[in-house]
Amino acid sequence: MCGIVGAIAGRDVVPVLIEGLKRLEYRGYDSSGIAVLESGSIRRVRRTGRVAEMAVAATQEGFTASLGIGHTRWATHGGVTEANAHPHVSHGVVLVHNGIIENYEVQRERLSAFGYVFQSQTDTEVIAHLIHYYMQQGGDLLGALQCAVKALTGIYALAVMSQAEPGRFVCARMGCPLLIGIGDGESFVASDISALIQATRQVIFLEDGDTAEIRRDGISIFNAEQCPVERSLHLSNVSLSSLELGEFRHFMQKEIHEQPRVLADTMEAAIDAAGFPPMLFGAQAESVFRGITGIQILACGTSYYAGLTARYWIEAIAGLPCQVEIASEYRYRKAYVNPQHLVVTISQSGETLDTLEALKYAKALGHRHTLSICNAPDSAIPRISELICYTRAGPEIGVASTKAFTTQLVVLFQLAVALGVLRGAVDAEGEAAYLEQLRQLPCSVQQALNLEPQIAGWAECFSSRHHALFLGRGLHYPIALEGALKLKEISYIHAEAYPAGELKHGPLALVDADMPVVVIAPNDSLLEKVKSNMQEVRARGGELFVFADQDSHFSESEGLHVIRTLRHTGVLSPLVHTIPVQLLAYHTALVRGTDVDKPRNLAKSVTVE
């Protein structure tokens, strides 16, 4: 959600800023801008719309400089206008900001009384004026920033430069990701490593409360008490190829097709261990797992659906009660606390604000044991978790999550079996059987991917529809939810999902010839129940699109379309059936001509409430 990039070097940094912002587009945005300090003067360009349009304007105006900052904005305070786009300027102070300032109205009134005139509706402009105010009181840029952040309530990542101090820029972090890149005689700042990968692989992750001074010849970092501190230097393993399309038309398509490989990468430790040892989740996991009596999962969006799937596995395989809750709901209610329950948070980015705050809330309530499942090392949620298990999905650029979701499912399945083995609910034979199912999973997923031409053929049937209904039962109900979410996210077709058994309790009223109904119908113990639900749809003139197993014994007829995946894959069937609903959403969006990788109004990393 929003993106920051900044650079100071002995070369022209404008190409670095533009390329960095392009690599941050996946986070979601509606406007962008850069500002540079050139020959003692500030030059700025801002545009609504795509970064490419802003970049053309910067080129036409001949931007070139050795110091600059840039930003992609996802509107929160104020509409999508050029005046509200970043960077903001106040009397030679230039600033970009991610986050939300909660007390901006109070500060705005205060600054207006001092004579400051506001040009935008944003909370960000308040910070620029505030920093200038403290500089007027005799402070330098860094000191003014440190004074300003003490006056702010909320979350932020900031990069600031001043016309009065052309040899450096400064930054600050509280609640929003921000990292520093170290180059050879040049330094950078960004909200995401992908923005800097073309310039450096050496990065330092700032912590909450940190401020920093960024110079060509080095950096200085200060903690919340303004004391100098050292933060660890990391070497990023993100590759440029993982951030490029290659042979694919969209990142979403690429990431769907990467799933056999990333699933194999994620399960590699279990395969190497020939089982599901607790150490997959950290050195202290065994002692923690032995003492727990239940699981509480907290997540948002697609990660929440992964948690819903995990509940079936954890209760059936490990014999432990499992609750799953949307993080943004959990954090605002008086929740039940059992110190012997393990709190599991799931987040692709590791920075999802509601999930992060829900975890902090759970710990404050008295939950002692926490596990983070995340795709981003050194992000905020893992840093405050007792146990960590990283998915190995690699960078996910498409806003609609695909490979991050299925790798989360693999980790959650491993958790269920590890708990089952430790509790004696799974014997050696059962563990070996689960391991074999896991080993076969990448091949099964590849077979599902081979169905893409057939699924693309269905997309024409959906492209002119305004609504769709997804049905599933048991383990596959969360996959129906995920399918509906994917369709609405990228094709803008209103879609809902229900347990198939709930049809007659309301959703059946929606069914008619104009309502396509997608059914996930594996050959499991609930298949006959699902077939009965399908008959209810057919009796009302509904058109059925069924994803079935090879041996589910469906025959196509008018109003009944069937794509067979493969023979039933047991408890891992939800992962295999995820692939067809991803492909259906993708190809429907293609036919409708929407922006697949950057759907309107959405952001990849949701770092505000």
From Swiss-Prot:
Name of the top EC class for this enzyme: transferase
Domain SIS: 285-425, 458-599
Positions annotated as active site in the UniProt record: 2, 604
Coarse class of the protein's main subcellular location: cytoplasm
Gene3D superfamilies on file: Glucose-6-phosphate isomerase like protein, domain 1 (3.40.50.10490), Glutamine Phosphoribosylpyrophosphate, subunit 1, domain 1 (3.60.20.10)
Gene Ontology CC entries for this record: cytosol
GO function term, MF aspect, one: carbohydrate derivative binding
Reactions catalysed, as given in the entry: D-fructose 6-phosphate + L-glutamine = D-glucosamine 6-phosphate + L-glutamate
Documented EC number(s): 2.6.1.16
Iron-sulfur in keyword set: no
Subcellular location: Cytoplasm
GO biological process: carbohydrate metabolic process; fructose 6-phosphate metabolic process; protein N-linked glycosylation; UDP-N-acetylglucosamine metabolic process
Keywords: Aminotransferase, Cytoplasm, Glutamine amidotransferase, Repeat, Transferase
Glutamine amidotransferase type-2 domain residues: 2-217
Disulfides per UniProt: none
Keyword DNA repair part of the UniProt annotation: no
InterPro entries noted in UniProt: GATase_2_dom (IPR017932), GFAT (IPR005855), GFAT_N (IPR047084), GlmS/AgaS_SIS (IPR035466), GlmS/FrlB_SIS (IPR035490), Ntn_hydrolases_N (IPR029055), SIS_dom (IPR001347), SIS_dom_sf (IPR046348)
Family matches, as PANTHER family: GLUCOSAMINE--FRUCTOSE-6-PHOSPHATE AMINOTRANSFERASE, ISOMERIZING, GLUTAMINE--FRUCTOSE-6-PHOSPHATE TRANSAMINASE (ISOMERIZING)
Assembly with partners or alone: Homodimer.
Function (record text): Catalyzes the first step in hexosamine metabolism, converting fructose-6P into glucosamine-6P using glutamine as a nitrogen source.
Protein name in the entry: Glutamine--fructose-6-phosphate aminotransferase [isomerizing]
Lineage: Bacteria, Pseudomonadati, Pseudomonadota, Gammaproteobacteria, Lysobacterales
